[in-house]
Amino acid sequence: MVDYSVWDHIEVSDDEDETHPNIDTASLFRWRHQARVERMEQFQKEKEELDRGCRECKRKVAECQRKLKELEVAESDGQVELERLRAEAQQLRKEERSWEQKLEDMRKKEKNMPWNVDTLSKDGFSKSMVNTKPEKAEEDSEEAREQKHKTFVEKYEKQIKHFGMLHRWDDSQKYLSDNVHLVCEETANYLVIWCIDLEVEEKCALMEQVAHQTMVMQFILELAKSLKVDPRACFRQFFTKIKTADHQYMEGFKYELEAFKERVRGRAKLRIEKAMKEYEEEERKKRLGPGGLDPVEVYESLPEELQKCFDVKDVQMLQDAISKMDPTDAKYHMQRCIDSGLWVPNSKSGEAKEGEEAGPGDPLLEAVPKAGNEKDVSA
């Protein structure tokens, strides 16, 4: 009979795992691998120190016993030295037993340590030849995944949302047992996107709840990839491990959860900023005048004396200011005002004589009120 209990001692992590695009995969697995390697190195260092200490203690015991035998054979009068060596030998044997007990505890600890991708197996062969099916084109696989996700969400969206609202471990396990088809990549992807949507809508408390369930599904998927089994066949093992209050495993879960929530907040912030930029650009395009210029930008580029004229909406004041300017500059600024819609030719200008050209200070131009955004820049 196969002993499946060893599966309870597997630390799920694999640097080759794939995660949803919204998750910073590189940082996630780099941190896990680094933390695991550091723990293994620290454990190995402690084990080597214990081994050295035990060997040194055994050496001292052997040396002390050798001296005792020499004194006993010599039958000299060194009774005091003999008693001292016997006391020392007794103390050293106590220390030896202490070192051996520590080594035994270390071996038990090593035996109970969770397996991981670095210790799960050893090379049986240095070279293997495996026939593999040719991979499908990346475009086809991506398109197929998108279609699969869309179909799955359309069918099970209500159930996925129900799972995302669960709080207790037992409730989550029972719901997945009753709806085992939800244990898949599509559920995890939907929950990630839902978290970002909730953060954009400023539903922070609800986002944190759904984020917790997202990490539950992510950890189950990682366990399945580590064991190379279907996620539906191993999700109960995740709940068994997490409910046994394994401190190290629980701390790892909490760390990944907090890191995920930070990434969700960052992604939501970027989405909001992008939407604001698109909105501002759309509003700017709405403001554009007949010549394609933004009245706000044109107003801000005008000399101060012309800006004052627009502020007080005084046509005569504007014409006086223009008449005092260099004709080239005046024509340049007035043309920009017309192109932006700050000024439009007077509708009565059609009464002017044919062929008569209106200049910057021509009274045939008058101010037409325009709706502004940040400033009322119309005269």
Swiss-Prot record:
Constitutively sumoylated by UBE2I. Co-chaperone that binds to numerous kinases and promotes their interaction with the Hsp90 complex, resulting in stabilization and promotion of their activity. Inhibits HSP90AA1 ATPase activity. The gene is Cdc37. One of its GO terms (cellular component) is HSP90-CDC37 chaperone complex. Its main location: cytoplasm. This is Hsp90 co-chaperone Cdc37. One of its GO terms (biological process) is positive regulation of type 2 mitophagy. The modification N-acetylvaline is found at V2. The modification Phosphothreonine is found at T119. Residues 124-146, 344-379 are annotated as: Disordered. One of its GO terms (molecular function) is protein kinase binding. The lineage of its organism: Eukaryota, Metazoa, Chordata, Craniata, Vertebrata. Keywords: Acetylation, Chaperone, Cytoplasm, Phosphoprotein, Ubl conjugation. Pfam families: CDC37_C (PF08564), CDC37_M (PF08565), CDC37_N (PF03234). The modification N6-acetyllysine is found at K155. Probably forms a complex composed of chaperones HSP90 and HSP70, co-chaperones STIP1/HOP, CDC37, PPP5C, PTGES3/p23, TSC1 and client protein TSC2. Probably forms a complex composed of chaperones HSP90 and HSP70, co-chaperones CDC37, PPP5C, TSC1 and client protein TSC2, CDK4, AKT, RAF1 and NR3C1; this complex does not contain co-chaperones STIP1/HOP and PTGES3/p23. Forms a complex with Hsp90/HSP90AB1 and CDK6. Interacts with HSP90AA1. Interacts with AR, CDK4, CDK6 and EIF2AK1. Interacts with RB1. Interacts with KSR1. Interacts with FLCN, FNIP1 and FNIP2. The modification N-acetylmethionine is found at M1. InterPro entries: Cdc37 (IPR004918), Cdc37_C (IPR013873), Cdc37_Hsp90-bd (IPR013874), Cdc37_Hsp90-bd_sf (IPR038189), Cdc37_N_dom (IPR013855). It comes from the Eukaryota. Belongs to the CDC37 family. It is found in: Cytoplasm. The modification Phosphoserine is found at S13, S121, S378.
